[in-house]
């Protein structure tokens, strides 16, 4: 992506700040205020709004990873990585040493239809597609207009890590783990670091393939298949 002229940099930075502000507000309201029933539509609408911000700021569909030219490449990479993820998760469930990592009380009481909703709609569309649009699409594209690749990836990935603070706190509460303050802080900090690193890898995948489809499929497969694995472990145990 071409860098903008110095005279336009401050305008793009303003759009970046607006996108970050939208994400921050959405993160708080989505985790603390809005009912779960509106999770998917709220995220879809926010994603569309962010794409609108990027387009107004001068980003093209190709800049966002949404162009048709690289879609086939993104699809191939995404499906290949999803297959590797599936094999890894299956091995994790089968091995006694790692099986316990899949215990998650949030899926324990799900019915078949609720599980299908989580794995086929809520996670792929409400989580994976939205977060990839936001962090590997809009933010990365706008950051690349004002800085080089490494800082752009670093900022996008750091924000992706911070994005997971509130969801991690909710997960800790639901599973009644890391009850002490120090343990909770450590768990949240660990989650931020892990997701930031994951975000950097997804950025690399996005840039390598030229398509947002690859990180979307990777993200969706990882989260959806992990949910199915957790459900299987809960039922079996």
Predicted regions and their residues:
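Aromatic-anchored segments of alpha-helical transmembrane domains
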Residues: 16-28, 86-91, 157-167, 223-228
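Alpha-helical transmembrane segments in multi-pass membrane proteins
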Residues: 5-59, 73, 77, 109-118
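C-terminal ends of transmembrane helices
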Residues: 58-63, 135
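Short, Lys/Arg-rich N-terminal segment immediately upstream of the first membrane anchor
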Residues: 1-8, 67-69
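Short helix-capping/hinge motifs at transmembrane helix termini and TM-loop junctions
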Residues: 29-30, 57-58, 96-97, 164, ...
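Juxtamembrane helix-loop-helix connectors linking adjacent transmembrane helices
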Residues: 32-39, 61-128, 144-145, 174-183, ...
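Short acidic/polar alpha-helix capping motifs at helix-coil junctions
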Residues: 10-18, 103-108, 119-121, 165-169, ...
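Transmembrane helix-loop-helix hairpins at the membrane interface
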Residues: 114-237
